[in-house]
A protein has these predicted regions:
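Short secondary-structure junctions
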Residues: 31-39, 83-88
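Catalytic cores and adjacent binding grooves of peptidoglycan-active enzymes
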Residues: 14, 50, 55-57, 63-115
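Active-site acidic/histidine clusters and adjacent loop/turn architecture
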Residues: 1-35
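Active-site nucleotide-donor binding segment shared across nucleotidyl transfer reactions
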Residues: 36-52
Length: 115
């Protein structure tokens, strides 16, 4: 089940890129089937033009309900199923960017050239 850390995130999620929406919902289903866990959206929009969040092409998902091994397994599965299409970037990144470990999910702009 796809859940939101705060109600305003649900409203922001309604604005995300169509492909991103589908990928996040697929992640939610896969996570529920493999690990019997819900998926929680923790961040959508950010007011920083250098961030994919600014363009509604990225969201962050909670990872603390999974072990590190499970997180890496999910990351590998999602990146195989939904390749970003522009190296060295990935669709799903399990990382700590200073605010704690989480999943960053992103899609590239449709006009981006594949590399």
């Amino acid at each position: 089940m796809l859940l939101f850390n705060a109600e305003f995130l649900r409203e922001e999620f309604d604005l995300v890129d169509r492909k991103l929406n589908k990928i996040v919902n697929a992640i939610s289903t896969i996570k529920e089937v493999l690990f019997e866990k819900n998926t929680v959206v923790t961040s959508v929009y950010r007011d920083d033009p250098d961030s994919t969040h600014y363009y509604y092409r990225a969201v962050d998902l909670r990872s603390r309900d999974l072990t590190e091994k499970e997180c890496k397994k999910l990351e590998k599965i999602i990146n195989q199923l939904f390749p970003y299409g522009k190296k060295p970037y990935q669709t799903m990144l399990y990382h700590n960017s200073g605010s704690g470990w989480h999943f960053h999910i992103q899609v590239r702009a449709e006009h981006d050239e594949e590399v």
